[in-house]
Curated annotation (Swiss-Prot):
Gene of this entry: UBP21
Extent of Basic and acidic residues compositional bias: 583-609
Alphabetical list of PANTHER family matching this protein: UBIQUITIN CARBOXYL-TERMINAL HYDROLASE, UBIQUITIN CARBOXYL-TERMINAL HYDROLASE 21
Record GO terms (molecular function): cysteine-type deubiquitinase activity
Gene3D superfamilies listed in its UniProt record: Cysteine proteinases
Cited function: Recognizes and hydrolyzes the peptide bond at the C-terminal Gly of ubiquitin. Involved in the processing of poly-ubiquitin precursors as well as that of ubiquitinated proteins.
Skewed-composition ranges (Basic residues): 719-732
Protein name per the record: Ubiquitin carboxyl-terminal hydrolase 21
Organism: Arabidopsis thaliana
Enzyme class: hydrolase
Amino acid sequence: MAEFSDPPPSNLSSSHKLTKPNQTLDESSPTAPIRDLVTNSLSLSSPIRQIQALSPAKPDGSSSSPPDKTLNFNPEENRDVNPDESSSSPSDKTLIAPPAQISPVSNNNHLRITNTSDSYLYRPPRRYIEYESDDDELNKMEPTKPLQLSWWYPRIEPTGVGAGLYNSGNTCFIASVLQCFTHTVPLIDSLRSFMYGNPCNCGNEKFCVMQALRDHIELALRSSGYGINIDRFRDNLTYFSSDFMINHQEDAHEFLQSFLDKLERCCLDPKNQLGSVSSQDLNIVDNVFGGGLMSTLCCCNCNSVSNTFEPSLGWSLEIEDVNTLWKALESFTCVEKLEDQLTCDNCKEKVTKEKQLRFDKLPPVATFHLKRFTNDGVTMEKIFDHIEFPLELDLSPFMSSNHDPEVSTRYHLYAFVEHIGIRATFGHYSSYVRSAPETWHNFDDSKVTRISEERVLSRPAYILFYAREGTPWFSSTFEQLKTVFEATPLHFSPVSVLDNSYESVDNSSKACNDSVGVSIPDVKWPDSCCQEPKEEVFHSAESSNNEDSSAMIDALGSPQSEKPFAETSQQTEPESCPTENKAYIDKSEKPFAETSQPKEPKPFADRASIDAPLLKVQNQDISPKRKAGERATLGGPKLKYQKPNSHQKRQGTFQIQRAHLQTKKQEESRKTKRPLFRSNVAASAPDPKYKNHALSYLNRAQTPRARKLANALSDSPTKKKKSSNMRRSIKL
């Protein structure tokens, strides 16, 4: 076995020999070539390129160890040495390491091997090995900086637009339409100031489109920079249309029309409880998206003209053989001949008529649907042609003569929906929103990215949203709402707004537009709390900055306070929870001002008759010991206070058995038998046939309850089988 030791200082030798006094390598032996081959292979496979000296040699070149046991490496001399050459002494053979594999740093490097058994190639420890990389750039690379983790999640700055919407299974067509609604400023203003009855006229007690849209827009604006779920709309997809199927791709324009139809139904009140306001003023859908067309029919025989007004919530444009939105509008409003030989009301003859459509009423928000899908009754194909759409659109050339000249006809593009795919039922929908004149964002499900205007104009638009000139940009509206949101924190978690727990709260109140109300800021109430009349959780930012907390609560209670999404309808408290869950709090200890006067708690003596448990006991009787002391102080007869026996509450086994025997003895003396169970079970069967059948059935079971039932039904109690009988019956 080879032994390694640190080399002592020694002189360098130029013999390059591994000298051993007792062992030599005999070239004449049959194993000599194999030994040379193994030695060369080991040296060639070694990854060592440089070896540092374990200890430097002395300056004078002397060494305390014999030179015949030292292997010195010199690249200048090893380069000319042949391994086949032998030394001057035939008994001393030389083993030379290949210079291409081992090269010393200096001429003073040496390595000493002390061997007692056989020859061994020495591999120095790794701490004395230096590696040089051929690539200098790797040596200049800086080490990776460690991650700086904190105890809190990094703060995500708002993006200036609404939150992204998670795709929970083919919901991209819902998300794209909701993103356009979220960034429609006239719709946001209408939802904030709209008053609707309770319950609404949506036709569904479990789901209200109006309330769901208000909650979604509010949550999306509060969660800017994050992502939220839209499962509430997905789960109620069949409510919008019976043709829709959950987890299936549907057409975005069809969903848009169905959504506006259901939203308009929530706005209309058939009873017209607010008699001073007309139903047209209550319809926020018509106020935001409602437009109208003037259809003109001209008789080619007598030139008589008839005009018809056609209301609409958007317009669908044919895009075949056109490449711009302007040409599609020209094709939409051009004169069309009807060859159906219609009967003229004036000349009473079947004639050919000409029809022309013109815009008569322009809404604050105009939507244009580009018909990219054509259906021939068998197959549906998509038109992939790029349609150019302008950022600014003037509709004055397409207006009717009855149009009000004071109403502006200029519009600005602020959002649109695109479809990527070959069919309407396949592919993917995404939306683009223009929050400022030069700021565009792409909403691809939960991913929200900033995008350039040039890239926006090159996208294949499917539904275009134009806002009338003079409408505030979304960025300014978002800054105003952001100030209000910072002053009024959200009182419910983002997940609970759209999940099933929130829907269960709506179901409990039997009103689709109710939610859990709170009256104190920064207090989170559980979903299982009593359903109170909805208190609005928002107030104006001015009052929150200048008034104290009590004034903020008063502002919340007042209906005149400014709120982002105000509830102004009068609602009565539903009886959705028992009165035992209510509690009265002492008014003197409340830190905030109350908006309503609580009921006066009843005395403690009448506690059995009150409706709810008291949080603070009032008029409580003093203890008997204190009462006895007061009597002695006032000169009355001093009563001796006897401490109650604590063992009475925890009786032992003997006391329990004694009480049981006394009770049993009293019952026997009174000749009364206490029933072992309910009387309806213990009643005997009227028919003895059924009685015997019941006894035979009960005797099968070997449970205490079965034996009690059998004893009650029969005059003679049945005896319990012994264990031996049970074993015998089993063997049989």
